[in-house]
């Protein structure tokens, strides 16, 4: 084992690691804005937010068109240039970037116009502006996109072409959906819709054509060629093909409601090898054959890894994979073993947990083994370790390591799709399979390289069918294929492989899980391409459902293009009988030899009219109940922010097919209600966009608080407060309501919603404290136990689950066996305001605190709002409370003046002058501690309810504490020995033998030398010719002596000896002995002439303070404002003197060179050292 020598790691004044540098082990902390990062974020957005409206428009602004600048656009070009080794001419490059910048500027204007129109859709001026902006945007895109197809540069410009095409399709969809409300006539809208459907095909075919051209261009025979080929395939899948595969969803008439797509294609990281370069001649085809052929999607369960050894080097020699069909609908199956079954070590089992493996950290090993002279040398290319990390949306899961963790990080080439959350939650791909590249060439080389396959996270483990969206399921997620069906490579625009059938019969079966009530009805659509007319038949659990005639879409022998595929369906709706069902698709009535390709099936909700009408009526009643009148000028006082969110959920769950216009109208009213709620809420950032974002406004809190997105209880962000290990360090969240926002003689109310809590304390503080401890049992969920999957495809809550029973009055009607929220989850506290004073700015402190280890809370929808003016008894009560508070404040001021004066004198006595830049020569550590204790006698430096909030005396307290801190710093700087008090363990000390650093009951760290052969030493730089004082505080147990020696390289040695003090000992240059040390210290008090004289006496209580004052102060503040027992622990307030038996000795030393050595040892027994100081004498 190699032992590192860290002797030279000590540096003056800082023997510890840099505290500003933090390494997050196992976490990818760098976030980039590369083309791949941007494209993954866009794909995530298109998969999750593909709904027309201002939200989609502004989302494109945030992700690309309002964010990406010239440097990022240039990066899109450089990415492909490097892959194909072709440079775009400067003119074409500048033209492309200028056009993209122009489109970005224009789209930002379009987005702002859209946002303003959506906020006020009946405004004629805004409607006219929307027509103008659409026409300008459409014209600009129609003109610009051909400029991204410059001859000879089609491939390098491909990724920016796709970005512009995506923008154009989104704008055309906007006019197809909103054009009539913008004032366009039906003929114009239909014309633009025809443009939309035509351009979906045009843009798709162009992108796939030039992708294939570029891919062919980078192919070559050697391993280096394959690496570039695979990189092109992987990166352009992410930046081009994934986006193109979602273009059909822009067809607003085929997909009028939210549509969920899945990408089942796989991408590949390179075989994990070191020195994997062009030296492997002719191996490209061999490596490509290592990639799996088109196949049904399966779910990786486990990898069993085998280890072999070669010339003393262990490596991954082979592995075996187990997997399950989609939905785990069938028994687990095992793949044939890859590589060889080595037996150099026990097999390692990697079992998939959480949401799958999202990251690998691999350690490739290359060794050139010398077998002798001549050509017998052998190269070993293997993998000797990999760490597998598991995805989770909630908490870190322990990784599994095969042998060791490496540095080849899969996230470097397949980054997360969301860098705002940890990679375990923001990941973009899961590990789907591992193959093995195996090669051996006799005595030349041995090669074993696992190759990892990755599938996009949108490919769900199951086939879930909810009621509120169109669900697209790729048929490669089938669990069985018919006898005439095969899986073939997709054409590039389908997001994965597809099925092919050449003879009539069953195509495939899928296991589907219904998350909607079984009464929900659906219609099935099929996206297919066919060289012949045919019939499709469907059945559920063996029960025939639909059959219909479908026409041919392409000629025999033709290439598969976007226009070859058609989406068609059955008109008759149906419903499922079981929550988990087998869906079967068959093809009939066509001649064998023809070709039928099926990409996916789609389940489209067929809304039942009376159900939709009932939902609409209920939503209308709930929305109208929010307001004080029909003109929606004001909110009812009892309408909470949580109430508005629930009404919003009710509106969002309305059918967009049945009552689209009514839904939009109700949505506008709810948004208006939410704006009114925001206007009356005096809290800053009530939706928790951040904590500790600004030092003087918004929320402040402890670092263990987390902000989480909405769940099935909260629509907006909410906070989670965990328990704490120590009452003096509570979990806390607070905010101050500024005096300027408050009205005199008015009652205000704090209210919100608590999902669950234990030992949650809530405070409102002004003249006194309003305090409540809230324990709310968690509901676990608002969803009934009968609902199996109340979550969406990306883990988001499905608030439209039909079993949810919600009452607009927020009264809970719980059926037996179900969970729900009830009134105890709503909390409110009120506080009365007397007269207001902007100069004093007393304000109101809002505090949430947990000081118990088993405490916790989840809360949100917080509001602080005006309730009513004070009159009668409540007015008299607040005036009385205000007067009482002012009387107490005056008494506090009298005491503070006295205590502050004495504390300041004690602090000033530590220093030479009022600049506080030099200590008195005789200032020692005990004097600094004593002054610090006196400073801590200042009361009300911080609020007793939460000691991080400054109180009325915070200013003077922090002034003196700052000087105390300066004194400590000057004292430490004066000591040229580093870590002389052992507070940092043995850092900066050289150790021989066995020694310990222990923390004693008085919270001091001491060095314990238990054995005579042990030695602790430190090399110290000094100034030759100057005088120094070596001061040591130590304690000797047992027989023998403890020694602290100071010496130079040659001679000039002196030492301090410590024993049990049986008899007096006299040391050179030091007349202090164990027996007379205490006596001498007492004499020093009268002998000193510095400002520290009499310090011991001044430390005691001063008789000038009135004897009755302290109890008066206690009485004054016992009424609602108790002292904080933790406040005395701030700073050095808990300092305790040394226990009896410790002795301080010192000697004078005059070095002749610039280096001295301090050595600590003993002859027998135990030697305990509290501190070692080497102080430079004053000149």
UniProtKB/Swiss-Prot annotation:
For this UniProt entry, the molecular function terms from Gene Ontology, in alphabetical order, are: signaling receptor binding; toxin activity
GO BP annotations listed: sporulation resulting in formation of a cellular spore; symbiont-mediated killing of host cell
Q: Does the keyword Transferase apply?
A: no
Q: Which UniProt keywords are listed?
A: Sporulation, Toxin, Virulence
Q: Is this entry keyworded Cell membrane?
A: no
The further comment given in this record reads: Toxic segment of the protein is located in the N-terminus.
Member of which family?
A: Belongs to the delta endotoxin family.
* Protein role: Promotes colloidosmotic lysis by binding to the midgut epithelial cells of many lepidopteran larvae.
Protein's name according to its UniProt entry: Pesticidal crystal protein Cry1Ad
